Amino acid sequence: MTSLNLNFRVSVVLVILLSIAFIFINSGFDLEYIIPRRLIKLSAIIIGGSCVAISAVIFQALARNRILTPSIMGYESIYLVWQALLLLFVGTSGSAVLGVVGNFVVSAVLILLYSFVIQFWVLKRFQHDMHQVLLIGFVLTMVLTTVAQFIQIRISPGEFSIFQGLSYTSFERAKPSTLLFAGTVLSILALFANKWVSELDVIGLGRDQAMSLGLNDAHYIPKYFSVIAILVAISTSLIGPTAFMGVFIANIAYSITGSPQYRHTLPVACTIAIVMFLTAQLMVEHFFNYKTTVSILVNVLCGGYFLIITMRARSQL
């Protein structure tokens, strides 16, 4: 058994053990409410974590940069602007009118529409200059974030507290209907990703090498940006913004696999994301008693590990 297979199997076993602990710790074996509710949250963790991991790894392959995530393109900022506008014009009753499912659908559709605008406006003009695409995405992110902050100033304190809750990663908002839809879409995309994974290996070599091997960037860049947009739309609408968690998750996966092949990196990245989310959720529920958020804990856990492996790599130079 190779060390790569061993690492993946260990991560899968860790996911299983953490899932069992998450479901049954302090549950009282309540099959009517507690355990079903935790199963829903566990499903959200698995789906959301997989979306975050896959989108981050694919985006870094396209950008040829391991310190960036899709959030730099402004996808999550659109979500925040929408939530702020909903509270500004409709108030707290807006969430009640739309409901969790309605908000999920509208948020996902808006993110996808924004991604299509990016593709037709930016990618068609600058598809041969990825740095220009990233720069425009960064500027759009700053503009949209500023718009969201401007709207926050105009809403009431009660509405602001609701907005703050929506701006953090949370698994409490998941519903069976949204999970079914998100899981179906993720499964379909996973099948396509499995067929395209050899292309990612070539893309990871660089644009010139990819073109010399027969890959046209005019074809694969829009395709993969569409996949990324769908994954980000699902994860953001389902569990909220994840900001730069994907940076830590993807880089930890690279360090564990030590392989340039994405058929190894993608599954490991998914298991790492699930482990991080499960660990953070367990700590939020049973250690911090909901006095902190999953986002903070995941950034601390992943950031700490990422710093350690960076220092180790530096010391080996």
UniProtKB/Swiss-Prot annotation:
Cellular component GO terms, alphabetically? plasma membrane
Superkingdom classification of source: Bacteria
List the membrane topology term(s).
Multi-pass membrane protein
Locations listed in the record: Cell inner membrane
Keywords assigned: Cell inner membrane, Cell membrane, Ion transport, Iron, Iron transport, Membrane, Plasmid, Transmembrane, Transmembrane helix, Transport
TM region(s), chain numbering: 10-30, 39-59, 72-92, 98-118, 133-153, 177-197, 228-248, 268-288, 291-311
User: In the UniProt record, does the keyword ATP-binding occur?
Assistant: no
GO terms classed as biological process: siderophore-dependent iron import into cell
- Gene3D superfamilies in the record: ABC transporter involved in vitamin B12 uptake, BtuC
Q: Where does this chain mainly localize?
A: membrane
Q: Name one GO molecular function term.
A: transmembrane transporter activity
Cite the Pfam families for this sequence: FecCD
> Knockout consequence?
Mutants cannot transport ferric-anguibactin and are unable to grow under iron-limiting conditions.
**According to its UniProt record, which protein family does this protein belong to?**
Belongs to the binding-protein-dependent transport system permease family. FecCD subfamily.
Q: How is the subunit organization of this protein annotated in UniProt?
A: Part of an iron transport system composed of the outer membrane receptor FatA, the periplasmic binding protein FatB and the inner membrane proteins FatC and FatD.
Instruction: State what this protein does.
Output: Involved in the uptake of iron in complex with the siderophore anguibactin. Responsible for the translocation of ferric-anguibactin across the cytoplasmic membrane.
Q: Provide the protein name.
A: Ferric-anguibactin transport system permease protein FatC
Instruction: Read off the lineage from the record.
Output: Bacteria, Pseudomonadati, Pseudomonadota, Gammaproteobacteria, Vibrionales
Point out the gene that encodes the protein: fatC
